[in-house]
Amino acid sequence: MADTQTTHFSYGVGFKPCVLQEHTKIYNHIKAKVKDGIIQIEGLTSSPSLRIWSSIGEGILSFKINNVVSEVFNCHMMPENVSVSFRNISPGGNTFLYTRELFGCNVKTATLMFSNRSGKPFEFIKAKLEYCDKVSTTRHTSTIPAGILPFVENVNSTSVLSRVVLSPKTAAMLQKWLREHKAHKTVSVMVNSTLAVLILTVEDSTKTVDLHIVDDMSLCNNPSKDWGVVQNDVQTKVNITALSAALGLCKIPGVFVPCIKFYESEVLEVCGTPVKLGSWVDTSLQVTLFCTPNLAEDTQAAVSDYFPISPSACLTADPADTQEEPTLSSNCQDSSVENSPALPLKRKREKDINKKSKKIKIAFNPLI
């Protein structure tokens, strides 16, 4: 008979419903994007934070709330820091969404309990919610799939080179322009301190935003203007669809306006800056975008390296121009064999030349 292992309750957190309700507007704005995301309880074991991760194409969305935990359970049995991650949508084919329940209406208490077997990481999660009618409750138990490793936030460890705060009107204008050029895949984003402008470039098309340059973010007190805290001129390339989505996610009326941060290593981050300075100090909403190479340029360079002699030059040579065909390189021979339409064209030209040569008459004068 196989040995059985007893499941032990290891750790639990209780949330502040009032804090969750304050963030309902933000959650409703991003809920479609975080449905398939990951929830993470992280930070100090005695006062962890709630974070939601999700993939946005070639970007990573992060929604974090501090000071949202009202109590913890079995804190003395845990290490100093905790980090447990689980999927937002419960596995098993059901439609239970943890975020939908946590940010729901009339929630009186909300707790998450994590358990495991001896010597193993967290394997099970139990959610319990009680509502204000003092009658209704929700209980849900699920497994935590192994190997869920959310994106490690190492971006904040690097220095910020420049910041640009956009007004809602400018952000909407840039979104529309990016959607019109989404077929080009990548967009170049550059900020220039001398000209005090933000420049977005897609091939031959350019969009320029004039900035009010300031020395500190605290001076960006008018959300209807475009501000810039530019320490260095910097440029990077990102995915055009991801940038458009990031601007829309970080633009929440009355709450956030989008702010573009330029980090070292060509990392771009779009975050939500509070409309009222000093508010939402325990909340962060950001989308991290990484440098995307220009695929068209890379493909052209690869083709140039592979074909040192242009294949088209081998195919367009006219046999009438030369009496003796030169020896072709291996690249040209391969190209002419693979491109079958060129062979009938060559035979047709030779046939026309033969016909012309037959019509030539040589006159002989015996008197000379």
UniProtKB/Swiss-Prot annotation:
- Spell out the disulfide connections: none
Q: Which organism is it from?
A: Saimiriine herpesvirus 2 (strain 11)
Known InterPro entries for this protein?
A: DNA_pol_proc_fac_herpes
Q: Where is the composition biased (Polar residues)?
A: 325-339
Gene3D superfamilies, per the entry: 3.70.10.10
Region annotation (Disordered) maps to: 318-343
* This protein's encoding gene: 59
Tell me any Pfam family this protein matches: Herpes_DNAp_acc
Protein name, entry field: Gene 59 protein
